[in-house]
Design a protein with these regions (language model features):
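Glycine-rich, basic loop-to-helix element that forms the pyrophosphate-binding segment
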Residues: 136-152, 396-414
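A conserved acidic beta->alpha catalytic loop
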Residues: 108-119, 369-380, 427
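Conserved donor NDP-sugar-binding/catalytic core segment of glycosyltransferases
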Residues: 169-205, 426-473
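C-terminal, non-catalytic tails of nucleotide-sugar-dependent glycosyltransferases
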Residues: 2, 6, 13-68, 289-331, ...
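Short, acidic, metal-binding catalytic loop of nucleotide-sugar glycosyltransferases
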Residues: 92-101, 352-362
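A short, conserved alpha-helix in the catalytic core of glycosyltransferases
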Residues: 235, 245-271, 300, 433-437, ...
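Nucleotide-sugar donor-binding/catalytic module of glycosyltransferases
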Residues: 40-288, 302
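Short beta-strand-to-loop acidic/aromatic patch adjacent to the donor-nucleotide binding site
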Residues: 154-165, 416-429
């Protein structure tokens, strides 16, 4: 079938399905956005407007690296048999920077048949004295990069491949971001930006990688940082540069070692780097360079050793992803709290799956009875306690439903070092679910809270982490996405850092629960889990989510919202307002583990229809530990 015809049929099918799932108004809005981007906004959509670039050039007119007021950034680029077209485009991107605060350090290991590489570079040196060049013997990518670093005189270093392109405002933006960090008194040792992939022209990019702020668990699963990374030269020298034994994943290894020194990184949500996709490039996938995986696993294993943590590094669910199976310290007991009102069929399915599928043996289950009215429920409780050794049923003394109050009451009876909040309409799928949740928490430097992958019965995602700000308040990552995919930038296939996870399945250290005083009972139904996780985060702890703990959540996709009942609608609105009051609207709307260039209207990680931050060249930077 003709490729264009096939694509057209796919788009029509998508439009029909979207209309069925979300209604005609949503389909029309999405369609209008698609047409706008495709026909009018596709070109150069990640570049600042022409007037913004001109203003930057005017600001820097007549200035040099020494007097422009920005820290000098030396870009390290090893050359090896670089095709002329790619080389010229790369050099043009450096020469065309809007600020003069750059130095380009080229270490050329090209063979004798590619003497034109040196000739082309020398041609460009006539245009720009900030280009320095050295001919070297080829010793591999890490050693060649180290050779380029020996030419550097800048306070900062950056890494760029010889076939890629720097955005015209890359060095200006990074220089300004460093100054912002200094003005705020924040660490400025390591920064990174967003990037885009392209084939022919950066004015027609394929896709952007809009990254979260520094996310340590995510980085252990894949090198999401990539380009453009900028770091202090002094740190590079302390580390001894890149390690040849990690060739193929030398940058990932470097970033891990840098972070051991800095304790965190700063993220600039601007597309400052264009990564060319072609045969043989890592942007085209791990299959292009098979040795990458072995090098990455070595880098990760060495990082664990250096940081005093123990675990096994394995291949992840998809190429270019990895999994750290942390060693659990001790044999911690988990107290599973399950609120229940009638619905004994759901509860039995839940309990049966726990006792028949859970590999971790050290747990207790506490069912918190909440105002059941069916006599059969109490008969079931007696039978269940005989059937399931260690099951206890305790009775919540207050009337009405208050999820927070019920779980706070259940905690009084818990004896475990960890608490697990679990809905009664959840069924265990994988035997290692509880073990995996503990792996993320019960090791030195682990998270305080961890959530699981929850599936609807039709094998679409119900929960893969919570993003604050979606829809104005909070939403679930990749909700309704079908099984089999990896999500945006592998985010449903790798352990993730999140601001919150759902209380339908939430593991937390009991000591942390007690420290933040449990759930806030002012959030009776909605946002209690979000509020809890944000308070845990504010106390200095991390929230993790893992795809390796899998459960089915029988929550109905078509369940009606609280807006249909006036009383419930008022309660829901009050809880929404309280979320803003407690945590601040600005904080809710800016989730550090999301990206301002992604949509706030949907849960699918699609690109925002509003990219004004990019078009205006808006410089914001956030440092995070």
């Amino acid at each position: 079938m003709n490729v264009r015809l096939k694509r057209a049929k796919e788009l029509v099918g998508y439009a029909v399905q979207l209309t069925k799932d979300e209604g005609l108004p949503t389909m029309v809005k999405r369609g209008a956005g698609f047409v706008k981007r495709r026909c009018f906004g596709k070109r150069a959509r990640y570049l600042p407007a022409k007037k913004v670039l001109e203003a930057q050039r005017a600001e820097m007119a007549g200035k040099t690296a020494a007097d422009c007021g920005l820290p000098t950034i030396s870009v390290l680029t090893p050359l090896y048999n670089t095709p002329e077209k790619y080389l010229r485009e790369f050099l043009d991107s450096f020469v065309g920077q809007t600020a003069p605060n750059g130095q380009l350090c080229l270490a050329d290991a090209s063979d004798a048949a590619h003497g034109n590489v040196e000739r082309i570079v020398k041609e460009y040196q006539q245009k720009n004295q900030q280009i320095v060049y050295k001919k070297i013997e080829n010793q591999g990518i890490a050693a060649n990069t180290n050779a380029a670093a020996q030419l550097a005189t800048g306070e900062y270093l950056a890494l760029a491949d010889h076939d890629d392109i720097l955005a015209p405002h890359a060095l200006y933006t990074m220089g300004k971001a460093i100054l912002q960090l200094r003005q705020r008194g924040e660490p400025d040792g390591f920064l990174y930006s967003d990037e885009a992939l392209f084939t022919k022209s950066i004015r027609r990019p394929m896709v952007a990688h809009f990254k979260p702020d520094y996310a340590p668990d995510y980085l252990l699963c894949c090198n999401y940082i990539c380009h453009l990374a900028v770091f202090q030269k002094a740190l590079w020298e302390q580390l001894g540069g890149e390690r040849p034994e990690c060739d193929g994943s030398q940058d990932h290894d470097l970033f891990l070692r840098l972070l051991e020194k800095t304790g965190g990184a700063a993220h600039v949500p601007q597309v400052l780097y264009y990564w060319r996709v072609h045969a043989g490039s890592t942007s085209g996938g791990a299959d292009a360079k098979p040795y990458v995986a072995a090098a990455a696993k070595k880098a990760l294993a060495d990082h664990l050793t250096r940081t005093g943590r123990t675990g096994t590094v394995e291949d992840g669910l998809f190429p270019s992803t990895y999994r750290v199976k942390w060693d659990i310290v001790g044999e911690p007991k988990v107290s599973i709290l399950i609120p229940n009102k009638d619905h004994t069929e759901d509860l039995e399915k839940c309990l049966h799956s726990i006792w028949t599928k859970t590999g971790w043996e050290h747990f207790e289950v506490i069912v918190v009875e909440n105002n059941s009215t069916d006599p059969a429920t109490f008969a079931y409780y007696k039978k269940a306690q005989q059937r399931y050794d260690g099951l206890r049923v305790v009775t919540y003394p207050k009337k009405g439903f208050n999820f927070s109050g019920i779980n706070n009451f259940g905690r009084k009876y818990a004896t475990g070092e960890y608490l697990l909040l679990l809905n009664n309409d959840v069924e265990v799928r994988s035997g290692e679910w509880l073990t995996e949740l503990l792996r993320q928490c019960a090791h030195p430097g682990g998270a305080a809270v961890c959530g699981a992958m929850l599936w609807y019965p039709d094998e679409t995602i119900q929960h893969a982490g919570v993003i604050t700000g979606l829809g104005g308040y909070a939403g679930h990552s990749h909700k309704y996405k079908k099984a089999g995919g990896s999500g945006y930038m592998f985010r449903t296939a790798t352990v993730q850092d999140f601001s919150a996870v759902t209380g339908a399945c939430l593991l937390v250290k009991t000591s942390v629960w007690d420290e933040v005083k449990g759930l806030d009972e002012a959030f009776a139904v909605a946002f209690n889990d979000v509020d809890f996780c944000l308070r845990v985060r504010d106390a200095g702890y991390r929230i993790a989510w893992t795809p390796y703990a899998q459960l089915t959540h029988y929550e109905s996709k078509s369940r009606g919202g609280d807006e249909k009942d006036p009383v419930k609608a008022r309660r829901f609105a009050a809880e929404q307002q309280r979320l803003y009051e407690v945590h601040g609207k600005a904080n809710i709307l800016h989730d550090p583990y999301y990206n301002p260039n992604l949509t706030m209207d949907r849960e699918d990680f699609s690109e925002s229809d509003d990219l004004r931050g990019l078009k205006e060249g808006r410089i914001t930077v956030q440092w995070r530990e």
